[in-house]
Regions:
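Predominantly five- to eight-bladed beta-propeller fold
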Residues: 17-20, 68-69, 152-211, 239-242, ...
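A short helix->beta-strand "capping" segment at the edge of beta-propeller domains
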Residues: 19-39, 203-213
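Short glycine/acidic-enriched loop and turn motifs that connect beta-strands
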Residues: 59-63, 109-112, 154-157, 243-246, ...
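Short loop/turn segments that connect beta-strands within beta-propeller blades
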Residues: 75-79, 119-123, 197-200, 260-264, ...
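Cap/lid segment of the alpha/beta-hydrolase catalytic domain
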Residues: 244, 286, 430, 438-561, ...
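Active-site-proximal cap/loop segments of hydrolase catalytic domains
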Residues: 503, 508-509, 516-711
């Protein structure tokens, strides 16, 4: 039996505390308000004795328009969760120390983000770090005598410092690329500091990258998983792309470095000591350049997330083969520190590796990877022989191994369930067991639609996997308006994901059938399928979308006169392109943060390796046949003379990946052509919509637009 969370403690400032919510639901249909009331499970750590775990749950207040993270403990035998913290300040990153008697975590209770310590029962809270800068993350050495602290340092390579006598000046003098990244102007970089810990206080922090302008972890999404301690606590393996400015902007070549804490010496584990990179042309793809054809044993692409084997003999990490290709297949590279030999142990797995961890005996690794629209758990030995440990219609993410090595802890989600914590016993034919019931209230009181796997024949005779999500209380004798969901990435899987924005069940709850194709360019179907999108945005992947909607439209319960297409990022590009090429299939479009003009995108985005690889080169360079690259000659904005359908354009003005000018351009175009259109701008959001009230406004605007034209 699985127990629900109990022993909820009332905080001193109950009116300000954002915690677990059980709102009164108006019906059994998912609503934006219900979606934002759900808890979101974060980090999870098991105690050294394997009897309990500490984990974080983030809750959102629509009224206060902010989030708050709370710590819980979980009894791994009874499955009972107990709320551990009641502060109005968020706590996160919790881990056990002192044999499991104490928990260290991050909190901003003192006014800045610092490390705090408490007893395992939540008593005796005390601050143990007092750094001048905020601590973003941390990692204790196995002997707990040292700790890595991630803190920001000034970085003024691209944006120079203003004159000291102009402290109120807001202008920025920019001298190189990568002056902005994701949603931030780059004036600092995260660095790892190694500090001493005596069990009570943290001090004497030393910057591993002192004097270097590089970042570790890598921005914008890297975390403490990009660093690892050796089992003897003497070495640190860390991830770093030692480049700045334009060199950084065109390259995905990060490496794994080994740092000796006693001597301060650093060794690059990915390249020989005498390696010198060849000169590259910055404004065209690195695919066929010399950088991707080394004549020595070099790792040229993304190398990140190192983990030492428990016996200390090996280091494993995630490795991509090619520089400049951020969606290359991620392989598991294992380096034998005795022989200095590298082995890629997932070569026979025809998809990429997500998270991974070592077995207790150092003889195998566990990993997750997507295959045919589902992310399951696998095991590989050091010879590269792998097997599946789960085969569920779900998406798993590894959290770690139990101290005795007998259980894997993981999070599992699906299109019908947000993340919950599961345990997978590592014995023959064992099934994953659910440990948490964070959102049980919602699952007990809401009705979700059926999710069905459907294979569609493509124009070139191949098979395309689509997920079809039906409305709750589906009646096959009725006709339903139907949505084509266009995935972003452009090489991100349409797997069994749960999204708090692009949520399939909330679309179904509004009486829409949704078809979500794994079109050309998505992982989980082999390398040929994955790479048939690069340089050809408007080709087979667009035909795959049309094949999917045409196939489902033949069903008697689909109202083929009321079809819509929706999508974000590359999905937004897809919507803009389909608007001029759909042959009157659709009656409404919604594009979120999409690319409207590919030439505009090339010169506006910040990570230049991405358009170089996907578009082939800069728009001012010709392709090998002397023509303009196909991605530019088939840009969505070149088909606006054929636009004839109402369109909603949504964009965040802090989105530096795809600038909001794309949405403004598309909206202006539609209105000038007399087409009904609406523009939803978020001045304070990036590529995503993260604030509760903005999220609800997004959902309401989304469905008002669809209902207006499809119902």
């Amino acid at each position: 039996m699985i127990a629900t969370s109990t022993a909820i403690i009332t905080p001193a400032k109950a009116q300000d505390f954002i915690g677990k919510q059980q709102p009164v639901l108006q019906s059994d249909r998912m609503t934006p308000e219900a979606l934002w009331a759900m808890g979101r499970i974060g980090g999870f750590k098991v105690s050294p004795n394997g009897k309990q775990a500490v984990y974080a749950v983030t809750y959102y207040s629509v009224k206060q328009n902010k989030s708050h993270s709370v710590l819980y403990t979980l009894d791994l035998n009874s499955h009972k969760s107990t709320q551990l913290t009641t502060s109005t300040h968020s706590e996160m990153g919790a881990t056990y120390v002192n044999g499991g008697k104490e928990i260290v975590y991050l909190s901003s209770e003192s006014g800045s983000s610092q490390l705090w310590k408490m007893n395992a029962d939540g008593t005796s809270r005390q601050q143990i770090s007092h750094t001048q800068s905020d601590v973003a993350d941390f990692l204790f050495s196995p002997d707990e005598k040292k700790v890595i602290l991630i803190m920001e340092v000034d970085q003024n390579h691209s944006i120079q410092k203003n004159d000291a006598d102009l402290p109120l000046a807001t202008g920025m003098v920019i001298n190189d690329l990568m002056y902005k990244h994701w949603d931030t102007y780059v004036t600092s970089a995260p660095h790892p500091f190694v500090a001493d810990f005596d069990g009570t206080t943290i001090g004497n922090a030393q910057d591993i990258l002192k004097g270097e302008p590089y970042e570790c972890p890598m921005m914008p999404f890297g975390g403490i998983e990009q660093l690892a301690w050796s089992p003897d606590s003497k070495s640190i393996a860390y991830t770093c792309r030692k480049k700045v400015g334009k060199d950084y902007a065109i390259s995905t070549d990060s490496d794994i470095f080994l740092y000796d804490t006693a001597t301060g010496s650093t060794t690059n584990l990915c390249k020989p000591a005498n390696y010198k990179a060849p000169t590259v042309e910055a404004d065209r793809s690195l695919k066929d350049q010399a950088i991707n054809h080394p004549n020595t044993d070099c790792n040229m692409g993304y190398d990140q997330n190192p983990q030492f084997s428990p016996d200390g003999r090996y280091i494993a990490w995630s490795s991509m083969e090619r520089d400049g290709y951020e969606s290359d297949r991620t392989r598991l590279c294992v380096l034998d520190l005795r022989s200095n030999k590298k082995t890629y142990v997932t070569e026979k797995f025809e998809s990429g590796v997500n998270e991974f961890c070592w077995s207790k005996d150092s003889k195998s690794l566990y990993f997750t990877g997507v295959w045919h629209g589902k992310t399951n758990i696998y095991q590989t030995n050091l010879k590269g022989e792998h097997k599946a440990l789960t085969a569920d219609v779900a998406d798993y993410a590894l959290l770690g191994l139990s101290p005795d090595g007998k259980n894997l802890y993981c999070k599992r989600q699906s299109m019908s369930s947000a993340d919950e914590v599961f345990v997978l016993p590592l014995k023959k034919e064992a099934k994953a067991q659910q440990l948490t019931q964070e959102n049980k209230y919602f699952y007990d009181n809401l009705t979700f639609g059926k999710v069905e796997e459907r294979w569609v024949k493509t124009v070139d005779g191949k098979e395309e996997l689509c997920w079809v999500i039906y409305p709750p209380h589906f009646d096959p004798n009725k006709k339903y308006p139907t949505l084509l969901f266009c995935e972003g990435g452009p090489q991100s899987p349409v797997s069994q994901f749960w999204s708090f924005r692009w949520n399939m069940q909330i679309m179904a709850a509004n009486d829409y059938i949704v078809i979500a194709p794994n079109r050309r360019g998505l992982p989980g179907f082999g390398m040929e399928w994955l790479e048939e999108i690069s340089g050809d945005y408007s080709g087979l992947c667009m035909q795959d979308y049309l094949s999917a909607i045409d196939d489902i439209a033949r069903e008697p319960y689909v109202d083929k006169d009321h079809l819509g297409a929706v999508g974000a990022s590359f999905g937004g590009y897809s919507v803009y392109w389909l608007a001029g090429n759909h042959d009157k299939r659709f009656k409404a479009f919604i594009a979120h943060d999409g690319i409207y003009n590919t030439q505009q995108q090339y010169v506006e985005t910040e990570e230049m390796w991405f358009p170089n690889w996907d578009m082939g080169s800069a728009p001012w360079k010709k392709a090998a046949d002397g023509q303009v690259q196909k991605v530019f000659s088939t840009s969505p904005h070149l088909y606006v003379d054929k636009w004839d359908t109402p369109i909603l354009c949504i964009h965040g003005q802090k989105d530096f990946r795809i600038e909001y000018t794309h949405a403004e351009s598309a909206f202006n175009t539609a209105r000038m052509r007399g087409i009904d259109a609406q523009l939803l701008l978020f001045p304070d959001e990036n590529h995503w919509v993260l604030k509760p009230q903005n999220g609800i406004l997004w959902q309401r605007t989304f469905f008002r637009w669809l209902d207006k034209y499809l119902k």
